[in-house]
């Protein structure tokens, strides 16, 4: 009889302990900031960021998903100014969101780089001008990372720059900036997903023609890479 009571006691104690651990897990607060163009094309059914939300929202300790601070045609310097000025959308302040977020994706750099390359022909005569411009974008991103790190102590993933100019001659510039950014993120303990290489693996990941967009297949490929990183960097540490 005493043994039965002991077994029942241990059983319910175990249930209470498991419930306590689950209820005291840190909330998963997921945010993406930066450029909206990467995932706003009307040719896709669901973008990679929303696919991540779909998976994270199934967790008992899911908190929030913020994509308020993604914009069309935003530059890195604009993002820096937004943080400095603590801009708000419907009384949601960017500094507060960054402080509360523990899974953060940053997407910036594509707008200004692709705009520059669309205005300047890719040839040896223009190489210096283009590389100098890439270095300036890099400096802005470095400042942005410093601002974000001052506010955020969570896991951060930076999305690399991909070639949406439709011109393969520009690949050398994307390889150059991605290598610099990869080293920068590594030195700041930020994970890096190089979209240039991810999207170049399959011709179905990008549309054809002058206006290049990421397809459904491309978004799923990015989602798979990102969610695996989120699982490795954050989710499994909560077990």
Where is each model-derived feature located?
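Conserved SGNH/GDSL esterase-like catalytic core that processes O-acyl groups on lipids
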Residues: 28-31, 37-124, 128-139
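Positively charged n-region of N-terminal signal peptides that target proteins for export
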Residues: 1-5
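Sec-dependent signal peptide cleavage junction
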Residues: 18-26
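Short amphipathic alpha-helical face segments that pack within enzyme cores
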Residues: 15-16, 51, 221, 225
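Alpha-helical cap/lid subdomain in secreted, periplasmic
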Residues: 88-239
């Amino acid at each position: 009889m005493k043994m039965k009571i002991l077994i029942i006691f241990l059983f319910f104690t175990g249930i209470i302990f498991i419930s306590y651990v689950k209820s005291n897990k840190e909330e998963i607060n997921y945010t993406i900031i930066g450029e909206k163009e990467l995932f706003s094309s009307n040719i896709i059914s669901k973008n990679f960021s929303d696919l991540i939300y779909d998976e994270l929202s199934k967790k008992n300790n899911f908190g929030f998903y913020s994509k308020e601070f993604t914009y069309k045609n935003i530059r890195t310097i604009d993002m820096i100014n937004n943080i400095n000025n603590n801009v708000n959308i419907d009384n949601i302040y960017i500094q507060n969101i960054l402080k509360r977020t523990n899974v953060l994706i940053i997407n910036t750099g594509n707008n200004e780089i692709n705009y520059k390359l669309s205005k300047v022909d890719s040839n040896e005569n223009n190489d210096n001008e283009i590389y100098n411009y890439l270095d300036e974008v890099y400096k802005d991103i470095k400042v942005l990372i410093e601002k974000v790190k001052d506010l955020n102590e969570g896991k951060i993933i930076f999305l690399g720059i991909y070639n949406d100019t439709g011109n393969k001659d520009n690949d050398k510039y994307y390889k150059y900036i991605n290598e610099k950014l990869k080293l920068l993120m590594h030195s700041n303990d930020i994970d890096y997903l190089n979209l240039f290489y991810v999207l170049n693996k399959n011709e179905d990941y990008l549309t054809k023609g002058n206006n290049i967009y990421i397809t459904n297949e491309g978004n799923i490929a990015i989602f798979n890479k990102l969610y695996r990183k989120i699982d490795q960097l954050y989710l499994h540490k909560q077990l």
